[in-house]
């Protein structure tokens, strides 16, 4: 029989069929009862699987690509081996029961954000903090920092820093900017140094976080600018030498500085090139306002992380590691109890005048600070046979003072308490001074192993800032004023770092009576 023309025959004729056929008389459809092998791709649109049971894909060539949505799957999906790639899912995914996931690496590496909503109480164990979210000892940064020092200078220069000007230069307080301008001329050696009147105590086991804000002069040849937690012997600071940026550790222990140039920083180099050495993609410009930070894990051999806070993020630029390092056989610097310092210096002749702006600083003990039980308690007082006779003209007379030894000017000493006892009934007034200078009397070492001297008979007050003033009642009662945390650090003994002059903690008294005698005592805590 001749093969018919398909366009002329309807329905088609089937030839050479060796399998059983079935005709659906109602529809006219013919079904072949056999397994059909399909060569090529079959595109399947949306498939709704509404029945319970298993979907068997065995025997097919993998991978199986499904385009479109698969909805209405109930039951188990088992026996999947290999990788499953799931494109982003929009909407909610409801999961009932346990989800067990096994993979081959530990710990898991997760990129991006994970948002989890817990409908019931659950135990969440988080460990292994790293980077800027943790402090220097690996603890998650939480909201319990203890502020040891801060300076804002909103309305006045509060005298928290000493200045040392060499050659042509000056320091100008700018009230409407709450900042200071450090200005130098062009001659070699012109410099302005600014350092706090006291160092800030490091407590072992606590991360010490320092933040300094500034704006350096545009870098130029022979102009060096520095900011950080340091003094002439030890410390951690950021430096621009006119050509390069550096992170520096100054060591009084080794007598050298470890200077790491920007292109060798082991964190984010802030070069703007992106990639592994600059994951933030940010470029550092020291001539713009910046927030420099350092967190110190001292213990003599700990790590120091330094960097900048930019757009609200702590960016670690470099980490100095000291434990278990080749060649390290002693502490990396003498102490971490150090002052805040700013410097601008001409290392040789400079083409034009320069200005660095000092803005704000803070020193924080992360994880709190326990003053009680720390250091050595000491005291000084008048002996019973030698009270102090007050003047009859109601003028204030110094009765007792303490100060740092000239050899221990970086010691941390906190006055904790004082007591005053009049010997007769009268009206007595007293004043407590910090940052005082007196004349006369004799300074006595508190002990051979103490950093403090006391004076039981100063003659006159030369200068000082009144920190407290009040009255003693007229019934021979004692008065005491224990200094409590966190206010205790406001009374820390200070010194002028560039002249080596120790400032005094001083008590003066006055009375309306005549020939009035008093006793006085002071207690303090020597932290370092």
Language-model segments: residues:
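Low-complexity, Ser/Thr/Pro/Gly-rich disordered linker/stalk regions
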Residues: 121-250, 255-268, 322-394, 398-407, ...
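Localized edge beta-strand/strand-to-loop motifs within extracellular or lumenal beta-rich domains
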Residues: 287-303
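Extended, low-complexity segments enriched in Ser/Thr/Gly and acidic residues that occur primarily
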Residues: 1-164, 370-426, 469
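Beta-sandwich interaction modules
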Residues: 278-286, 290, 475-502
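Noncatalytic modules at the cell exterior or secretory-pathway interfaces
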Residues: 334-344, 416-418, 494-513
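C-terminal interaction-tip segments
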Residues: 221-242, 313-316, 500-502, 508-528
């Amino acid at each position: 029989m001749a093969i018919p023309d398909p366009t002329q025959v309807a329905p088609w004729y089937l030839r050479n069929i060796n399998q059983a056929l079935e005709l659906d008389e109602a529809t006219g459809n013919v079904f072949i009862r056999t397994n059909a092998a399909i060569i090529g791709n079959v595109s399947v649109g949306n498939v709704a699987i509404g029945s319970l049971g298993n979907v068997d894909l065995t025997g097919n060539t993998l991978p199986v690509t499904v385009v479109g949505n698969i909805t209405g799957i109930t039951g188990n999906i088992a026996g999947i081996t290999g990788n499953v790639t799931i494109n982003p899912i929009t909407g909610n995914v409801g999961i009932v029961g346990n989800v067990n996931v096994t993979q081959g690496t530990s710990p898991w590496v997760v990129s991006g954000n994970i948002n989890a909503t817990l409908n019931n109480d659950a135990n969440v164990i988080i460990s292994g903090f790293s980077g800027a979210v943790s402090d220097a000892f690996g603890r998650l940064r939480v909201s319990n920092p203890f502020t040891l020092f801060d300076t804002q200078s909103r309305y006045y220069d509060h005298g928290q820093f000493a200045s040392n000007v060499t050659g042509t230069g000056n320091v100008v307080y700018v009230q409407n900017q709450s900042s200071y301008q450090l200005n130098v001329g062009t001659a070699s050696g012109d410099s302005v140094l600014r350092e706090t009147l006291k160092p800030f105590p490091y407590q072992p086991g606590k991360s010490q976080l320092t933040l300094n804000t500034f704006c350096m002069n545009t870098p130029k040849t022979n102009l060096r600018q520095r900011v950080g937690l340091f003094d002439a012997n030890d410390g951690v600071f950021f430096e621009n030498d006119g050509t390069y940026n550096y992170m520096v550790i100054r060591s009084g222990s080794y007598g050298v500085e470890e200077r790491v140039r920007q292109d060798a920083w082991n964190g984010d180099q802030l070069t703007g090139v992106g990639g592994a050495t600059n994951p933030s993609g940010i470029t550092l410009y020291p001539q713009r306002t910046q927030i420099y930070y350092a967190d110190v894990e001292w213990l003599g051999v700990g790590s120091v992380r330094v960097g900048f806070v930019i757009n609200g993020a702590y960016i670690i630029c470099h980490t100095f590691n000291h434990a278990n390092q080749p060649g390290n056989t002693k502490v990396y610097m003498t102490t971490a109890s150090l002052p805040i310092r700013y410097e601008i210096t001409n290392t040789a002749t400079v083409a034009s005048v320069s200005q660095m702006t000092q803005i704000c600083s803070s020193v924080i003990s992360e994880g709190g600070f326990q003053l009680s039980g720390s250091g050595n308690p000491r005291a000084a007082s008048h002996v019973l046979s030698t009270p102090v006779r007050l003047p009859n003209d109601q003028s204030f007379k110094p009765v007792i003072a303490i100060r740092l030894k000239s050899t221990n000017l970086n010691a941390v000493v906190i006055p904790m308490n004082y007591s005053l006892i009049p010997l007769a009934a009268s009206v007595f007034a007293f004043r407590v001074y910090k940052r005082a200078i007196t004349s006369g009397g004799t300074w006595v070492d508190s002990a051979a192993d103490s950093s403090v001297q006391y004076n039981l008979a100063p003659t006159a007050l030369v200068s000082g800032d009144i920190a407290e003033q009040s009255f003693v009642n007229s019934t021979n009662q004692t008065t005491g004023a224990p200094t409590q945390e966190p206010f205790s650090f406001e009374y820390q003994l200070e010194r002028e770092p560039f002249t080596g002059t120790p400032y005094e903690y001083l008590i003066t008294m006055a009375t309306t009576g005549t020939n009035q005698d008093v006793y006085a005592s002071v207690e303090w805590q020597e932290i370092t």
